[in-house]
């Protein structure tokens, strides 16, 4: 991984302050939902209304009256005023329309649960910008970008919906989210249990903080995915780093690397660490989107893309040049499966979305997730977790320093057994599962494991190629939601 422990993402078209420092594995959580065109529609467009609600910029202070418009989407085709429910998507780090169109599970179960679907956009993402074009100007404007403020937005929006939509006032609400949104769904149930009767937190790494889990668990799972997908695959990747180091020692070697990897720009010796970070991030992204069918989540990819990649990485005991030619073929599966890309751009994974800006600030304040590699239990170069280095980079970038223990102080870390009605789902292929809840905590804090699942596969729309493990997971999730809805109405009936 990176020599300075951080991957520099340059968004020079925005402004000088837009240079972002973010570790590849951590940025993957944010960039996972930020395609080049985040409002692109799926093959079958969803029918929803686009609405706006006036939110306070600061819910927890009393000397500011500034407000902004939070965007949210509503779909009520299958909603029933009698015995119905509200499924509330806790928006995360990106454009809410993209989330709406890519969370097919909610659309698939809406009729069965007689549900209204609500997708709430997270402040500072998409169109929900508290200070408009100045929202990312400096840390003073970004000061209100916190999970706590976002949860308060969700609470106020639910109150507004129940107050203004006839028939919604006395209906149960269930929070649903994936990845960071899954963390928010769980935290929302913890902090506002009177607002939602339960939460589905898919691929939510709520324990990827401080020392709650080993810092190397994420990259270890990435490595396991590659090791299981083809003979000698992870070993080939492990050996590629030294091959790159040796070949980049000379000008002719750099020139050869540029050609062999079909890069868009000539490599210099200063580019080598960035090149290795870019390659590392590619393997991370593949682990997260290792779906059982062809998909277009981050890039157009075949079914089980890691198996396809590993077909080119069967023999680690070859010359440096042949090994790296094989690495190119593997990279080409991710970046050029469509066959339309003429060269590979090692800055390509830095998307041009404001979502990346917001996430980099959150990673420098609250969402401080330790990652490390040792080159023994994983296929990456050794790299230790260095909080001071992160803190210094964050201060240089944003003028703020991280609070690594704040999330566990706010939400309890592993001491959450007093809460109820949260389903934590994780795919065993997903590297974020290492920071997730993978075992039942109580009868009502339940873990659902998807043996053939990558990153929140259960929230994707149903597919004929879905493995049995995800079909069972969705069935369990719906059963829990039905129980929460039934208990809500049973309790309401007893009170009258």
From Swiss-Prot:
Q: SKS domain: where is this region?
A: 194-334
Residues with glycosylation annotation: 47, 101, 317, 336, 345, 415
Catalytic function, reaction form: Cleavage of a -Pro-|-Xaa bond to release a C-terminal amino acid
Q: Which residues form the signal peptide?
A: 1-21
| Residue span(s) of the pro-peptide | 22-45
* Residues annotated as the enzyme's active site: 179, 430, 455
Q: Which GO terms describe its molecular function?
A: dipeptidyl-peptidase activity; metallocarboxypeptidase activity; serine-type carboxypeptidase activity
Indicate where this protein resides in the cell.
Lysosome
For the biological process aspect of GO, one term held by this record is: plasma kallikrein-kinin cascade
Provide the free-text tissue specificity comment from this protein's UniProt record: Highest levels in placenta, lung and liver. Also present in heart, brain, pancreas and kidney.
What EC number(s) would the UniProt record show? 3.4.16.2
Which GO cellular component does the record give, naming just one? Answer: extracellular exosome
Q: What class of enzyme is it?
A: hydrolase
Q: Which InterPro entries match?
A: AB_hydrolase_fold, Peptidase_S28, Ser_carbopepase_S28_SKS
SS bonds (residue pairs): 215-372, 233-310, 264-343, 364-394
**Keyword list, A-Z:** Carboxypeptidase, Disulfide bond, Glycoprotein, Hydrolase, Lysosome, Protease, Signal, Zymogen
Pfam families named in the record = Peptidase_S28
The record's note on quaternary structure and interaction partners says: Homodimer.
Which family does the entry's similarity section mention? Belongs to the peptidase S28 family.
Q: What does this protein do?
A: Cleaves C-terminal amino acids linked to proline in peptides such as angiotensin II, III and des-Arg9-bradykinin. This cleavage occurs at acidic pH, but enzymatic activity is retained with some substrates at neutral pH.
What is this protein called in UniProt? Lysosomal Pro-X carboxypeptidase
Gene field: PRCP
């Amino acid at each position: 991984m990176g020599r300075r422990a951080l991957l520099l993402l340059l968004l020079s078209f925005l402004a000088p302050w837009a240079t972002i420092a973010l570790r590849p594995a951590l940025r993957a959580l944010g960039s996972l939902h930020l395609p080049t065109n985040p409002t692109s529609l799926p093959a079958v467009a969803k029918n929803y209304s686009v609405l706006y609600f006036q939110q306070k910029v600061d819910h927890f202070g009393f000397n500011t009256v500034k407000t902004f418009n939070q965007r949210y989407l509503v779909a009520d085709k299958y909603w029933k005023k009698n015995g119905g429910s509200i499924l509330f998507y806790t928006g995360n780090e990106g454009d809410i329309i993209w989330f709406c169109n890519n969370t097919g599970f909610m659309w698939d179960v809406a009729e069965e649960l007689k549900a209204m679907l609500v997708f709430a956009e997270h402040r500072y993402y998409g169109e929900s910008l508290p200070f408009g074009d100045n929202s990312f100007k400096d840390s003073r404007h970004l000061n209100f970008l916190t999970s706590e403020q976002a949860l308060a937005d969700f609470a106020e929006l639910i109150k507004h919906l129940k107050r203004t939509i006839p028939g919604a006032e006395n209906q149960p609400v269930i929070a649903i989210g994936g990845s960071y949104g899954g963390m928010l769904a769980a935290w929302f149930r913890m902090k506002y249990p009177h607002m939602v009767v339960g939460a589905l937190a898919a691929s939510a790494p709520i324990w990827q903080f401080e020392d709650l889990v080993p810092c190397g668990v994420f990259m270890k799972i990435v490595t396991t995915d590659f090791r299981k997908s083809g003979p000698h695959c992870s070993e080939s990747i492990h050996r590629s780093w030294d091959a790159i180091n040796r070949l980049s020692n000379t000008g002719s070697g750099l020139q050869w690397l540029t050609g062999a990897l079909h890069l868009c720009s000539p490599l210099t010796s200063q580019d080598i660490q960035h090149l290795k970070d870019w390659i590392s991030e590619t393997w991370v992204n593949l682990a997260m989107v290792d779906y059982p069918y062809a998909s277009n989540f981050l890039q157009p990819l075949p079914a089980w893309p890691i198996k396809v990649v590993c077909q080119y990485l069967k023999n680690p005991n070859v010359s440096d040049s042949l090994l790296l030619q094989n690495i190119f073929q593997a990279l080409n599966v991710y970046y050029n499966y469509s066959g339309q890309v003429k060269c590979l751009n090692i800055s390509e994974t830095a998307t041009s979305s404001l979502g990346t800006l917001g996430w980099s600030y959150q990673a420098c304040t609250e969402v401080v997730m330790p990652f490390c590699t040792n080159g023994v239990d994983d296929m990456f170069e050794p790299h230790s977790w260095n909080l001071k280095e992160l803190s210094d980079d964050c201060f240089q970038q944003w003028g703020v320093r991280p609070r690594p223990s704040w999330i566990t102080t706010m939400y309890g870390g592993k001491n959450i057994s007093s809460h109820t009605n949260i389903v934590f789902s994780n795919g065993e292929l997903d590297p974020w599962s290492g920071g997730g809840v993978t075992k039942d905590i109580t009868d009502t804090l339940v873990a659902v494991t998807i043996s053939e699942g990558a990153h929140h596969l259960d929230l994707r729309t149903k597919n004929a190629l879905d493995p049995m493990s995800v079909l069972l997971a969705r069935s369990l999730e719906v059963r829990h939601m039905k129980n929460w809805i039934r208990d809500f109405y049973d309790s309401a009936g007893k009170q009258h």
